[in-house]
A protein has these predicted regions:
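Pre-Walker A-like glycine/lysine-rich segment at the N-terminus of P-loop NTPase domains
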Residues: 1-47
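Phosphate-coordinating catalytic segments in nucleotide- and nucleic-acid-processing enzymes
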Residues: 6, 48-202
């Protein structure tokens, strides 16, 4: 569970600080105030911790994070994420399951995050997903082609990770409780079910 999360100098957000979060939290604000950027930053950090030392993953955490930020925000250099005109760095501090993870970088940063510290010695034992505003089921093949084969900007990592997660067939005995409950609640709320035809992509 996220115990604490703060960001300094991310785009329009000079300071965002959350403490004492519950299992479900709501972020409300008018359009154009940087809500999505904050959530994408949180997602990129959590997904990087999830990937770090997972299986035979050889890369250092800061390398995984830098690449995740690049493909999530789709910027030519990481320094573009820093609030324009600010002399101080973009800084992120996260306390997750009582373990700390923090990093920072300035406007001149290209692709490498040098200043970072983490209490995580193994991968974060959870899965996170970001559900973007656009519908992805019918675009899944285009998203995979654009990113996996052509390595082009257009669909950021939030889309790609969601499509990959949806592609994984459910394994016998691996019907996670949270997902099962979520599907049941959605079915009750919508009075129906989602049926996806892999052959037609609809």
């Amino acid at each position: 569970m996220i115990d604490q999360f703060s960001i300094r100098n991310l785009g329009r957000n000079k300071l965002v600080s959350w403490e004492n979060l519950s299992s479900m939290n709501l972020l409300i604000g008018t359009n154009g105030t940087g809500k999505t950027s904050v959530l994408k930053m949180l997602y990129a950090v959590l997904k990087s911790l999830e990937t770090y030392k997972q299986g035979r993953e050889p890369r250092a955490f800061n390398d995984i994070l830098a690449l995740k930020l690049y493909w999530t925000f789709q910027v030519e250099r990481l320094g573009e994420l820093v609030t324009k005109g600010e002399k101080s760095s973009l800084a992120v501090n996260l306390i997750l399951d009582q373990k700390k993870c923090e990093f920072e970088f300035g406007e001149g940063t290209q692709t490498k995050i040098v200043k970072y510290a983490s209490d995580f010695t193994s991968s974060w034992d959870n899965s996170c997903i970001f559900i973007p505003a656009k519908e992805v089921l019918t675009l899944s093949k285009i998203i995979l082609t654009t990113r996996d084969q052509e390595n082009l900007f257009g669909f950021d990592d939030t889309y790609l990770d969601l499509v990959r997660a949806l592609e994984i067939p459910s394994k016998k005995g691996k019907n996670f409780q949270a997902f099962a409950e979520g599907r049941t609640r959605l079915s009750e709320l919508l009075h129906g079910v989602v049926d996806f035809d892999e052959k037609t992509g609809q």
